[in-house]
Swiss-Prot record:
Source species of the chain: Snake adenovirus serotype 1
GO terms assigned for molecular function: double-stranded DNA binding; single-stranded DNA binding
One Pfam family recorded for the sequence: Adeno_terminal
Residues annotated as site: Cleavage: L177, G178, G285, A286
Disordered as annotated region, ranges: 288-379
Entry protein name: Preterminal protein
Family statement drawn from the similarity comment of this UniProt entry: Belongs to the adenoviridae terminal protein family.
Protein function: Protein covalently bound to the viral DNA that acts as a primer for viral genomic replication by DNA strand displacement. Assembles on the viral origin of replication in an initiation complex with viral polymerase, DBP, host NFIA and host POU2F1/OCT1. The terminal protein stimulates the template activity over 20 fold compared to protein-free templates. Neo-synthesized viral genomes are linked to two preterminal proteins, one for each 5' end.
Subcellular location, principal: host cell
Site (Priming of strand displacement replication by covalently linking the first nucleotide of the new DNA chain): S549
Cellular-component GO terms for this entry: host cell nuclear matrix
Biased composition (Basic and acidic residues): 341-350
Entry's Gene Ontology BP terms: DNA replication; viral DNA strand displacement replication
UniProt superkingdom: Viruses
Length: 610
């Protein structure tokens, strides 16, 4: 038997190579050595599956006279069958941080190819895996602590930020915001802290360092933005320090507290910063949500040197400052791969925007015309806004570069472009003057639900579609995603269902769910009850509704449920897998099975006679 085939079966069945060689496995039912085996029929394989408890024993070490096969119902030999791919499926499902997993009984079907007369036995199993996200943490924090909103945002950052950036890594999947919240619910929202156990999560020291720095950069940026419209801080901070000013900036502002100002502005800025990164496709220049208001400077600028303006100097040296920060970290840089065109595209993305570009539309003044005052640093409103925007652009690029050092497979997969679409919706709502507190809360809640959905579907796609061995040997009969919104009493508020039978089911489901959520989020402030047929038809058209995707009434129920009412969201992933049944050609194993079967039937008959 070929070594390559043994290695493939080892990964699919979990059995040792020595056991597989001893087993002499084949999946061809026309093989003369197994043509008349009792398990070659559906009735026979079902009996063997029940008697030897295949759902459990197929996950164990079945080597001859091993710890498992020495005990009944075995007689020292492996069972006559191995379920090719079953072990792989169970291992992949168990490796993900689901809260609950349910596996159905294994069913068997005999398949016959009429054209070639090939026969094979196929196993099938339905898995249902789920976890919960505590979306109510947002509304509990924001709605109940409006008097201390600055402190509340700090709590949200501490409770959510690390959970947020872990989804960018995708090495170890995240269970959801609920995991962070549940650990500290007994102490209340004010007790939120972040102490991620990276070794337990199987995150390397390198990635742990990157994740912590991404966290610090985002905290520094949200604090800087919330302080920007305000007078300088009591302790004056000289900027831009030196060519390595980014390190001092992150160190200073990550330890500061957000300014307590308008709640909608604060939460909106927080939501925007949270979407920053390579997967969001968002540049720092897009962060000016309130045109013309971010004009203050929470620090003192140093005077121009050699008649060179500070902002223009920072813009020219932005890339150098970003790289200097990353080079200062105790990590080995990832070697970039890709075509020449991809490298050129990345370089163009990292190029600082020219003056006047971006939503702010503020043109940078000429260097010789930029003026400063001794105390504040910049005298003109446009100059201060331009400087602020350059700081945001620089930190935004730094976040993007840090995330580039993480797992590149997530960016290439296409499973994380929802951030860009959701952020685009946020800007659209702002332009339409619809960015109310309720809308922001709904957007933020839906964003995190989408993030966990994307992370899970990305993982499943990598395991069962992108993996060549799994794709060739494991069938994907259908995939279904079920979302249940619950109140704080556990009452079910709405249930959403998405279903697909294609081989690329996970990617198809992802695209449909993102489009669905965009439409639901955009309509969150609507007052219509969707009673008129034309209103329902328009709603379904906007969502690109597909049959077998749940009741239309449930869609409307989700729309009419306020974010504060949804305390938690349960995400369930139901997948039906299939694979071939392997048969042993070893006559020793075959004779052992016949003896075991005859003994079992004899015991059953004696029990019937008593």
């Amino acid at each position: 038997m070929a070594t390559r085939q043994i290695e493939a079966w080892h990964r699919l069945t979990g059995q040792r190579p020595q056991t597989l060689r001893y087993f002499m496995m084949t999946t061809d039912l026309n093989n003369r050595r197994i043509l008349r085996q009792r398990t070659a029929s559906e009735a026979g394989i079902r009996w063997a599956s029940r008697y030897f408890e295949y759902p459990v024993t197929q996950l164990l070490d079945l080597r001859p006279f091993g710890p498992v096969t020495r005990n009944p119902p075995f007689e020292g030999e492996p069972p006559p069958n191995l379920l090719v791919g079953y072990y792989y499926v169970m291992k992949a499902i168990n490796a993900y941080l689901f809260d609950q997993r349910t596996v159905s009984n294994i069913s068997y079907n005999l398949q016959l190819a009429l054209a070639t007369n090939e026969r094979a036995m196929v196993w099938q199993v339905l898995t249902d895996s789920s976890y919960s996200i505590d979306t109510g943490a947002f509304s509990r924090a924001l709605d109940g602590n409006t008097e201390d909103l600055g402190g509340t945002v700090v709590q949200i950052q501490n409770a959510v930020m690390m959970d947020r950036v872990l989804t960018s890594l995708t090495v170890t999947p995240v269970r959801g915001l609920g995991a962070v919240v549940r650990e500290q619910n007994n102490n209340g929202i004010a007790a939120f802290t972040v102490r991620p156990n990276f070794p337990q999560a199987r995150v390397s020291k390198r990635d742990a360092t990157l994740l912590r720095n991404i966290c610090e950069c985002k905290k520094a940026l949200i604090n800087y933005i919330t302080w920007s419209p305000c007078p300088p801080l009591p302790c004056q901070l000289d900027l831009p320090f030196n060519d390595g000013w980014v390190e001092d900036f992150v160190r200073h502002f990550s330890s500061a507290s957000p300014m307590e100002n308008n709640s909608q502005n604060l939460v909106g800025d927080f939501a925007a910063v949270m979407t920053m990164g390579k997967q969001a496709g968002m540049r720092g220049g897009a962060l000016t949500l309130r045109s013309g208001t971010q004009t203050g400077l929470p620090m003192r600028l140093r005077q121009r040197e050699g008649r060179r303006a500070v902002t223009a100097t920072m813009r020219r040296r932005r890339g150098q400052a970003v790289q200097s920060f990353i080079d200062s970290l105790p990590i080995r840089r990832r070697r970039r791969r890709g075509t020449r065109r991809q490298v050129e595209r990345e370089d163009s993305v990292r190029e600082p925007p020219s003056p006047g570009e971006g939503p702010s539309g503020i043109r940078a003044p000429e260097e010789e015309e930029e003026s400063f005052s001794d105390d504040v640093g910049l005298s003109r409103e446009d100059d201060r806004a331009d400087f602020n925007q350059e700081v945001v652009d620089t930190i935004g690029q730094l976040i993007e570069e840090l995330e580039r050092e993480l797992n590149p497979a997530a960016e290439e997969s296409g499973f994380f472009n929802f951030s860009q679409r959701m952020y685009g919706l946020l800007l659209q709502l702002q332009r339409e003057n619809r960015l109310t507190f309720q809308m922001i809360l709904t957007w933020l809640s839906n964003f995190f639900v989408l993030e966990h959905l994307a992370s899970t579907l990305f993982y499943l796609n990598e395991q069962f579609v992108r993996n060549g061995l799994a794709r060739r040997n494991i069938g994907l009969q259908f995939a279904q995603v079920i979302l249940r919104g619950r109140s704080d009493t556990g009452r079910e508020l709405y249930t959403r269902v998405w279903y697909n039978r294609e081989r690329e089911a996970f990617h198809t489901l992802y695209d449909r769910i993102v489009t669905d959520f965009i439409a639901v989020t955009e309509m969150a402030d609507t007052e219509t009850m969707f009673q008129a047929p034309e209103e329902r038809e328009q709603l379904l058209a906007d969502m690109q509704y597909v049959e077998n995707s749940g009741s239309v009434d449930e869609v409307i129920a989700q729309l009419q449920t306020r974010a504060q009412q949804t305390d938690s969201v349960e995400l369930s992933f139901r997948i039906k897998f299939s694979g071939l049944v392997g048969y042993s050609q070893n006559p020793v194993i075959q004779r052992s099975f016949e003896r075991t079967r005859e003994a079992a039937i004899g015991r059953w008959r004696r029990q019937q006679q008593q």
